[in-house]
Swiss-Prot record:
InterPro entries: HD (IPR001356), HD-ZIP_Homeobox_LZ_Class_II (IPR050762), Homeobox_CS (IPR017970), Homeodomain-like_sf (IPR009057), HTH_motif (IPR000047), Leu_zip_homeo (IPR003106). This is Homeobox-leucine zipper protein HOX2. Probable transcription factor that binds to the DNA sequence 5'-CAAT[GC]ATTG-3'. One of its GO terms (cellular component) is nucleus. It is found in: Nucleus. Residues 74-88 have a biased composition (Low complexity). Residues 15-36, 71-117 are annotated as: Disordered. Homodimer. May form a heterodimer with HOX1, HOX3 or HOX7.
Length: 308
């Protein structure tokens, strides 16, 4: 690009000089050709200034290495080769001095590149002891520790930053494992509670023994109920006869008379025969009835049941 610009500038310059010479030779006293020559000269000057500015910007952007390479392409002088070899040797020495162990962003030197720091066992042990005592250092402690270990303060600071990051990562892993076990324990507890809830619901849905025992006497009572076919009433076996039942069945009132007749028969069977005069007189019959009643009470009870 620069060669093209130079050739263009030289071509314009030669064209301008040629034009000026022709104009001067053809008509040296003419005033109309002088503005054209001045315009051409101004254009050539502008192009040269632009080329100089572009060359300066390229030199600043490329840097030392790029400038040396450009100079090496432009000219094969021994001075440029010596400068290139010295720059490469300096770079190799810097790489040899830098170790592998701790990332170091050395901002004090102004290089801005990432380097590796190799620590010895003694240096690592001292740094570990200091980290156990203080996880962070103030500037004075940082400088004192760097002077003690033969390091730069920036290297000590970066080592402490990395050590804190590793400690935080380990603590995060421990917390994650603890939370995982706690979640598993909560899941087991939740399953157990769900099982207990299902058992309680099944127990609530099933009939209780108290209700079953309460239903059983009602069934037995229903089995002992009797129905009168005439009055169509249901009554238990031990319930007393109702008045309406007696009205419907006046024949039940003859139970006492039949019982007295049976008592008289028993008395006759026992040898207590009423005399003939007592058979026709009510008083004597009543006395005989009382005597037979006492005999009936003394005898074994006779159970009579009337079926309707």
């Amino acid at each position: 690009m620069m060669d093209l610009g130079l050739s263009l500038g030289l071509g314009l310059a030669s064209q301008g000089s040629l034009t000026s010479s022709t104009t001067t030779t053809s008509s040296p006293g003419a005033g109309s050709s002088s503005p054209w020559a001045a315009a051409l000269n101004s254009i050539v000057g502008d192009v040269r200034r632009d080329q100089a500015a572009a060359h300066a910007a390229a030199a600043v952007g490329v840097g030392v290495g790029g400038e040396e390479m450009y100079q090496g392409r432009a000219s094969t002088s021994p001075d440029s080769a010596a400068a290139l070899s010295s720059a490469s040797g300096k770079r190799e020495r810097e790489l040899e001095r830098s170790g592998s162990g701790v990332d170091d962003d050395d901002g004090a030197d102004g290089a801005g590149g990432r380097k590796k720091l190799r620590l010895s066992k003694d240096q690592a042990a001292v740094l570990e002891e200091c980290f156990k005592t203080h996880s962070t250092l103030n500037p004075k402690q940082k400088v004192a520790l760097a002077n003690r270990l033969g390091l730069r303060p920036r290297q000590v600071e970066v080592w402490f930053q990395n050590r804190r990051a590793r400690t935080k990562l380990k603590q995060t892993e421990v917390d994650c494992e603890y939370l995982k076990r706690w979640c598993e324990r909560l899941a087991d507890e939740n399953k157990r509670l769900e099982k207990e809830l299902a058992d309680l619901r099944a127990l609530k849905a099933a009939p209780s023994p108290a209700s079953a025992s309460a239903m059983q006497p009602s069934s037995s009572a229903a089995a002992t109920l009797t129905m009168c076919p005439s009055c169509r009433r249901v009554a238990t076996a031990g319930a007393p006869h109702q008045p309406n039942h007696q009205q419907c069945h006046p024949k039940s009132n003859t139970t006492i008379s039949s019982s007295s007749t049976a008592a008289a028969a028993v008395a006759v069977a026992g040898g207590n025969v009423l005399p003939s005069h007592c058979q026709f007189f009510p008083a004597a019959a009543a006395a005989a009835d009382r005597t037979s009643q006492s005999t009936w009470n003394a005898a074994a009870p006779l159970v009579t049941r009337e079926l309707f």
